[in-house]
Amino acid sequence: MVQVPYSRITTLKDITPDVSNSKYVVYWCIAFKRTKYNFALQRAVEWANKLSQPLIILEPLILDYPMSSLRFHKFMMDGMKEVSETIAKTNAYYFPFIETEPKQSDGLLMELSKQASVV
């Protein structure tokens, strides 16, 4: 696999991941909801491989997007199904979370990150 170009990487917290107290790498999928041509996902895969830890892909779908509609949510869920089918062929774990009430996913990333080496 080709490495992510350095110009595409932004380090927010420059620390060495503590693999002794962590269980996985988390990729928070909120913008580029695709498995190909996705530098962020590629970088998460690189980290998971480097640390020999499983990759969890978290993709939340919240109810209160500005300008959201039933059509928008149908489109998003169709995409989630495609991503799920693609990820099922890999060693990663795909965790789609679809809110049934507004704000239901608040704190979800924070909770998963407690046991993550890299987010």
Predicted regions mapped to residue ranges:
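Trp/Phe/Arg-rich N-terminal binding region typifying the photolyase-homology
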Residues: M1-V118
